[in-house]
Structure formats: structure tokens, C-alpha cells
């Protein structure tokens, strides 16, 4: 039952009506209505449809002041964790910030707009439908110096207050951090991790390393939130079996160091204790670890047995926003009910259904504030009964009490350094050393830490390598804080040339920038643009979208030469972030943006860059396919063309440009690397009526569309005779003519002879009409077929001869007469009887 759960968690509920108090400033007007609110330790702040903020004292609910603004109807209000800043927004994409709520001076709302960073190379947030985005979620960063804003179009932007606090501000600039495909529902933060929940997915972001990961693979569609749960030792500190066992074993011991008991707030939280909870349809929650791996699914649809007497047990409640309560529980609500759930135990702790029409619910400490659509306000207080828990005492080993590092950091450091890690029992884990260092620096032994390092340096016949304190602490700030405690005797800081970490750790690669920590004024204009390019790229991976319009907004401000320079810088950034195939990814970004018409207008160097990128991109991605093709023994050109080609319109335009200027060397350089482009050159041969080249190219390329075009435009009976000669040479001599040097080359692998392969296919499969296109099923992404028939069917006697009759190039009797000269060379059964009927009737199907 619910009350049993309340007693189990040590909770008791109190309710206070606040409607009269909050309505006091509005008693003389009916026009002004409150639209949203937030609470902090000191204040209750309401946003109104007039654009003003109404500030109340939280304890007494006394009205304090009005903060006016030009925002119009306010839709979002969020107070920072220190209670000194306020973030507000409206439905038109405007954002306001109040910097010093506790100051004595008159308060001012500083305004900016979503997409305000566009002028500096930022990424705008006007949606694909053309509507203006608006803020749907706020999240204050660490130390309340950063404000993350999620909007209705899927953009998460960062506003860095540290850039302008204490200055005269003319404007504020938002920097895009993450681009997703739809509405942001909720944003939460834990250290450098940012958790973003949209209508369809949850994304975990490391803002320092710029890494992104989607949590789970199953999509959803609706307003579903997500949050971090960080265990709070001040609440629900129930003893484990191991705790009780250790406590019992130490009862009556004279070695109990009760004076060393640390406060709960000083207890460290292990990373593996932090959990992520993501809402799912059907009153479910996904539980994931700190790395974004889904561990289990919690079902709450049938958990509340107390609801059977009051409402339908099977009713599904959508968990829209997840709000943390007392460090472990989660509060969710809809427009009629409030639920307090324990996500770890999959249990409903509290259910409230008599609070009216709910608009917003906010939490601070043990107080739950409920604001109704009818302008009512109430406070629900959850009193926590603190339970005395037996302290986990140190165990005895061989009759002697061990010294845990949380209680005796000096011993751990002295033992580790002066024994140089050679004795048994030495604690060598990274967490142990960090905890010990922190314990020493915080405690009264900080002034003696110098002697420990001196003792460590003097041990052993050889001087051991020096401990690098800054690397153990993993940040310059932590190192500086520690150095302030140490003595200033410079003689003790002489270091050996060989310095290493005592604790091996994985340091992230050096980066050009960090999205969450870097200020815009520290970057050049090009670096800002590169930053935004990389951001769009990372967001496109998470969202599975192209974002071509985003790239266009950035690239349109630069000429081609500048874009090439930006791409080189972007490649460096990707390499530093351990992106695989960074060169190819940069090429893809540019080619997705490039309009082929520009190839005719740009300078020579830029055109050469595009040509080289086209060759590199296709050779890398089509490596296996190109390796399957035979090459000329003399000149090294491919004897046949490949089927796939990435960005064929770019390659085709390059061939057209060079051919129009009779720069044939560049054309043949392209086809030597990417033989697919012989399609385009063959078209020029047909167009120019180059009989000496056209027939040979048509045969080697094997494109039905080219054969049908040539049959209509230039083929005579003599041309069909030449084509039959090429067919017999290929079939009987296992040879193909090189399109570059005209040398007859024998195929090293008979299995790659297109006519032999087609003959085997015909023997293994039923005969199909070669003009029937419905049997073709091409599932290979990137394949470009230049005709209406599968390319393999091209190399068959039936297809070639039927094309001659169907295109009405020659009459049937002339074709039969031509074939009489080849009857002893053509395999038996290679030509179907339907072809002979066509010739006799001189009609086509």
C-alpha cells in the first residue's frame, strides 16, 4: 500500500494552501495571469502574460518585487541552483537572463534570441517547416555559469554567463551544442555529461570530449523526459547486510575511532552508482548506466495497488518530466495526478489525485509546489525521518584494525610512496590515491604532505620516478588548490627528467576546443566556423539527418578557396577527436553542399581540389569493387567500368568541363582512377560520331542505355558487324580491348569474362525477356544503372541482337544474313527462337 511505502521510506505528507498569498499582487487586475513558475531555496518566481516576473519569499510567501521585461507572455522560468540567476523565455524564441537576483540594484532582464549566433558563423534554429523555434527546456550548468537551452526544433544551445558577468552587456550570443531532429523535452546535467531527451530519443553528451551517444535503440513518439539519479547519502541511508555484519563484529572494540566519523556530505559517489532514467511509453522507465548502456526496464503501470479503490489500475500515465526528490526518488505528473516513485525498487511511493487541474510542479528540498491552470497554488511537504544507521567500522585483520583510506589518507600515502609499491597490500588503484590525496589536503595533515614525497624520492638504490600530482588530480585547478596547502620551499620541487603517473590513466587527446568551456572571444572567425562545422557533423550522426541546409548556411558566407581552407582545419579537428576516416568525412560534408554548376565558375586550384577529392573518396570506398576489375597490361587502365560511383554528378561535370575545353589529359586521368566515368566519355564519342571509339567503349562499358542510343543515332549494318566481332573475341579468346591504348588484353581470371559469366547465369536460371525490367532488383546503395536492363544481361547474344531489331536499325532479313557468317562461332542455344521469329516477321514485341 502507498502508506506502507511512505512509512518504509520515512516520509510523512503535509499540505499548505498558498493561493491567497500569491494572488495578493494581482487582486486589482484580471488581465494579468501567471503562466509558469519556479522555486529556489529563497524565492518563488512566477512568469506572467505581461512579460513581468513576480518574486516571492519562499518561506513566508510574501510578495517582494516585480521584474519587468519586454518578452510578452513568459513560457519558461528557471532559477539557477545558487538562486542568483533567472532564465526566462517566451514562445517567439526570445530568451532573457537576470544575473543578480540578490543584488540591491534594480533588476534587469537581458535579452537574446535563439539563433543569435548566426552572424558569427553560428547555426540558426529556424525549423525546416519555416516556423520560429522557442525554448522548451532550460538546464543550468556547473557553478551556474552556463545555461543550456533546448528548443522546439531540436537545437541545444549554450549561453556562457562567465563571458559577460560583471561587464556592460550589449548583447548575448548563443552557441549551438547539439542539433537533433525534433522537440527537446528535458535537459539534465551531471558533471560534464549532458542528458537530452527529445520526442523520439535520449542522447548522452560529454561536453568536454564532444562525444555523443544515443541511449537505447527503440524510438518513441511523445513528451518523455530523462534525468540522472545520483545517490544522496543524506537520505534513505539504509544499512546493507555487509554494513550490519561489520558493525556487529566491531561492537565493544576498544579500537573504534568514533571521533573520525565523517559527515554524510563528505562521502564520495562512485561513478557506477550514478544512473540514468529515461521515460518510455506505457508508464515505463529505462535504467541506464553512466555510459549510456540500458540495464533494465521498470514497469509502473501495475505497481500502485492502492489505486484499485480509487481509479483504474491499468491507466497509463506518460512520464513527461522527471524531477529528482531527496536524491533517490522521482516525481512525475500529468494534468490530474502526481506520482512519487522509487525507480531503483520499481515502486510507487506516493500518489496524489486531489490537487485539481495541474499546470506545473516544482521541487525544492522536501517541498513540492503545485500550480494549477486555475491560478491556484499549494505546497506539499515530505518530512523525512532520519534513521540512525550503524556505522560501517573497520574490520580486523590478524587482530589488528585496518585503516580505510576515507579515514586515514595519510597512512595510505605514506605506505604507498615510501614502500614504492613493493609490499603486499599496497593500494594502487587510481581512486584510492585520489581519495587519499583529497583526505590529506582537506585535513590537518596537509602541511606534512611534503615529507611523504621526499620520503618517496629517497627510497631504493635508484631514484624512483617523480609523482606527477597534477596528472593524478586530472586538472590544473585541482592541482593549484592542492599546491596552496604545501610549503613553499623551492628546493623540494626539483624533478627528474623522467616523470610519469603513478596511477596510469587514459587522458583524452588534445583538442582544439571544448564546447562547454571555451569562450567565443578566444576564437578566430575561422575557428568559430570550424567549431560549428564539427558540431553539425556530430549532430548529424546522432540525428541520422543530412543537415545540408546547416552546412549551406555556413559555407555560403565563404568563397571556394576559403572553404577548402576550412575543410583542412576541420580535418585536423576530426583527427584530434579520433574520428576515423576524417578526410573522407570532410569530403562528404563539402560534396553534400557543393552545387555542380560552380565547377564551371571556380578557379583552377579549387577545381583541382574537387577533382582530387572525388578520386580519393571513390577509390577509398570502392576499393574492393575496383580490385575485382582487370587492368591493361600496358597502360594500367581498367578494361571495364565499375558499377558504383559516389557523387557521379560531380565526376560527370568534371569530365564535361575538361572535354569542352579539349583538356583530354584530365579526362583520362579521371577515368584511369574511376572507370565509371567512361559512361560520360562514351556519350561524347557517340555525339561526335567517333566510330573508331564508340563501338569499343559501348562494349567495354556494358551500358544498355548507351547501346540503344547509338543504335538510334549512328549504327549501320557495318557497326553491328564490328560489335559482333568484339563479342566473338571476348567469348572465344577471353580478351578485351583497352579503351586507352587499344591493346588486346587477355583476362587473367576467366571468371571475370562478362560473356562467360552471363552464359553460366543463363544456364542456372530460367530465360527471361531481356527487355523486361521488372525482374531486376538492385539493392546496392550507390549503383547507377545507365539503362533499362540489368548490366549483366547486356553481355548476351539475345540482348544485343534483339536491340538491333527492336530499334529498327536493320531489317530482319539483313540481320539473318549477317548471322550466317558467324553461325559456326556462336554457341548452340545462345540465341532464342523468339529472335528468329522477330527477324522473319520483322516486328518487335
From Swiss-Prot:
It holds the Pfam family Beta-prop_HPS5. The keyword Flavoprotein does not apply. Keywords: Pigment, Sensory transduction, Vision. GO terms for cellular component: cytoplasm. InterPro entries: Beta-prop_HPS5-like (IPR056499), HPS5 (IPR035431), TPR_HPS5_insects (IPR056446), WD40/YVTN_repeat-like_dom_sf (IPR015943). Has a role in the biogenesis of eye pigment granules. Eye pigment granules are specialized forms of late endosomes or lysosomes. Biogenesis of pigment granules in the eye requires molecular components required for protein delivery to lysosomes. Belongs to the HPS5 family. This is BLOC-2 complex member HPS5 homolog. It comes from Aedes aegypti (Yellowfever mosquito).
